[in-house]
Structures are given as C-alpha cells and as structure tokens.
C-alpha cells in the first residue's frame, strides 16, 4: 500500500483503474471507524460499474495512516475538508472529482463542496450527518460500552494498525459536550454540484431528517434522495446493488 503526506500526516491510499486516463475520478471518504481495508471490495465494484477511476484513502488516525497524537477538536471535519483533502487531491493530480462519502466522510464531502472554491463534479452523500441527533448520541454511547465490554477492539484490528486511536478519536469527540451543537447546514447553500443523498430508513446513527435537510438546504444544487428500506447505517453493505445502481444512473447523467 503506498503512502502520501497531506496536512503533515502520512496517509495510506490506493488508486483504482488509474490507467483509465479519460475516466472521471471517484474519491471515497470513509466512515468514522472506517479505513481503506474497511471498504473491502465495494470501491472496486462501484468503479467497475461506473467506468470511473478511484481513490481510496485512510484519514489521519485510521487504517495504516498516522495515528492520532491528540484528541480531535469539534471542527475536525472542517479541517479535513479544507486542508487534508485538497492537499491529497493536489498531490495526486486529481481535479473535479466525484466525491463518495459515507457517514463522517459524507459530511466531509459536503463541507468540501460547500466551503471551498475547488471544482467538484458531483457528490454522493451516504448516511451523512449534517447535525447531531439524539439517536446518534445513543448509538455512539452504546459503541462506547461495547468497546469496554466486548471484543470490539479485536474486531477492528484487521482494519486499523492502532484500533485505540481509531475508536477513541471517533467516539470521544462525538460524545464531547462541545460537539452536541455541531451543525453544518450553513455550508449547504455553497454546494453547486449535483448531489445524491442516500440513507437507510433504519439507520441507527441518524434519521431521514439528515438527508431531507440536505435537500432543503442545498438550494443551489440539484439534489436527489434515495431512502432505502431494510437498511441501516451502511447502505453499501445492506443494499449494495441498490446503491451501485443508483450511483451508476447518477454519474451517467452528469455532463
């Protein structure tokens, strides 16, 4: 696995189908406990279905990337969107990508498209967070209990060199009192690319109000919503065929 330095941190990454030089780039931004390995073969399948090239990477604190050396701040997703992601894309010469974000990664994608002047061809936000809900806190508190009482650390070890860094970096900031008022709806009017927002109706980390707010708030973008039945917080695992088909149609309509 190659590494690259962005925002002063060593990050692991993988390029998919890089020889397809005329194809658009799909940039995958993982969830709050995700990594390159955690995606498994989904990025390859989606790139094959859409004819895209792909970039998959682990953010600081995850996978084989540098572990955290300090607690995350409440604005950590803003920092990722404004600094780490642009530096990474510039170094890899990736311009005008289609961003595919899951959970925290979807929030970072929304922030990047809404707050920076960088061109984004389109954005897929899967199980995104635009504000903190009671259901989010309850599920993250339950994860904290599982961390202390089950083998969750060992189950995360195949996906993270430092599972403590990955878990604590995610869990501690989401449960911090300063994070309860976190809200990124103010970035939504700045999004000017097509958006596909996907959420499972049984998502244990957020209600359908999350993507409904994107539809209301992204007033300068064309927003398509996909609400999936029998689907929880990871639609690409619970309903992979539906997700791939929807993204394939979405990308095929792009100019």
Question: Where are these predicted regions, by residue range?
Answer:
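Catalytic histidine neighborhood in serine/cysteine hydrolases
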Residues: 216-233
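Conserved HGGG/HGGXW glycine-rich cap/lid loop of the alpha/beta-hydrolase fold
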Residues: 12, 16-67
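Conserved hydrolase catalytic core segment
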Residues: 95-133
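Short beta-strand/loop motif that positions the catalytic acidic residue
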Residues: 191, 197-199
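Acidic catalytic loop of the alpha/beta-hydrolase fold
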Residues: 202-206
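Catalytic histidine-centered segment of alpha/beta-hydrolase-like enzymes
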Residues: 231-240, 244
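Active-site loop/oxyanion-hole signature of alpha/beta-hydrolase fold enzymes
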Residues: 50, 56-96
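Short alpha-helix in the alpha/beta-hydrolase fold that links the catalytic acid
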Residues: 193, 207-216
């Amino acid at each position: 696995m190659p590494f690259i330095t962005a925002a002063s941190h060593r990050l692991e990454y993988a390029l998919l189908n890089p020889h397809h030089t005329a194809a658009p780039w799909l940039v995958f931004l993982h969830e709050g406990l995700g990594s390159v390995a955690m995606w498994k073969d989904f990025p390859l399948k989606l790139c094959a279905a859409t004819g895209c090239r792909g970039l998959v990477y682990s953010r600081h604190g995850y996978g084989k990337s540098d572990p955290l050396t300090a607690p995350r701040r409440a604005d950590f997703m803003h920092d990722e969107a404004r600094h780490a992601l642009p530096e990474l894309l510039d170094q890899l010469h990736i311009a005008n990508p289609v961003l595919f974000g899951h959970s925290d990664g979807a929030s970072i994608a929304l922030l990047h498209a809404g707050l920076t002047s960088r061109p984004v061809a389109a954005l897929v936000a899967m199980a995104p967070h635009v504000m903190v809900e009671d259901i989010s806190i309850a599920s993250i508190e339950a994860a904290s209990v599982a961390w202390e009482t089950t083998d969750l650390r060992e189950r995360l070890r195949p996906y993270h060199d430092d599972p403590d860094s990955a878990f604590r970096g995610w869990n501690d900031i989401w449960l911090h009192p300063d994070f309860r008022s976190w809200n990124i709806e103010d970035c939504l009017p700045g999004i000017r690319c097509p958006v596909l927002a996907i959420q499972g109706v049984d998502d244990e980390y957020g209600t359908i109000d999350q993507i409904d707010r994107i539809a209301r708030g992204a007033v300068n973008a064309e927003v398509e919503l996909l609400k999936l039945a029998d689907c929880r917080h990871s639609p690409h695992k619970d309903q992979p065929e539906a997700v791939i088909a929807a993204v394939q149609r979405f990308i095929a309509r792009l100019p």
